[in-house]
A protein has these predicted regions:
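Sec-dependent signal peptide recognition
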Residues: 2-10
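Acidic, polar-rich low-complexity tracts and alpha-helical solenoid repeat scaffolds
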Residues: 5, 14-130
């Protein structure tokens, strides 16, 4: 009988829908946005990235699009995808040139190229870009 309850608890845990899965399946975009920012602020970038990816086309042309683009670029940087992060920071500067984050984004483009640069004895393309 004791083993039955242990197996039942284990099966319930395995097949229950996690809170993150409920967020992903939710239709409320404002709730998803708030949860993505919460994950971002808690440095859980692997959970924030799919939410930001899903929300980008939804918020395009709104007031939140600028902030979302900034978070999205930094999320890529934080997971170590420096090539994509430099591209996204560049797109951020093109789309929002008068933003308060534009100077920081220019620095992050150079820093992402620096992170991508190999040793000095190898190809120096990213070093020159930085």
């Amino acid at each position: 009988m004791k083993h039955f309850f242990i197996y039942l608890l284990l099966l319930t845990t395995l097949f229950s829908c996690s809170n993150y899965q409920k967020i992903l399946k939710s239709d409320d975009v404002n709730f998803k946005y708030n949860q993505a920012v919460k994950y971002y602020n808690n440095t859980d970038f692997n959970r924030a990235l799919p939410l930001f990816t899903e929300l980008r086309p939804v918020f395009r042309g709104t007031k939140r699009a600028e902030e979302l683009a900034y978070y999205y670029a930094y999320t890529h940087y934080s997971i170590g995808d420096f090539l994509m992060a430099s591209y996204l920071f560049n797109q951020y500067i093109i789309n929002y040139p008068r933003s308060s984050h534009s100077e920081e984004s220019k620095f992050m483009i150079a820093y992402c190229h620096y992170q991508e640069a190999p040793e000095y004895s190898l190809d120096a393309t990213n070093t020159i870009k930085a």
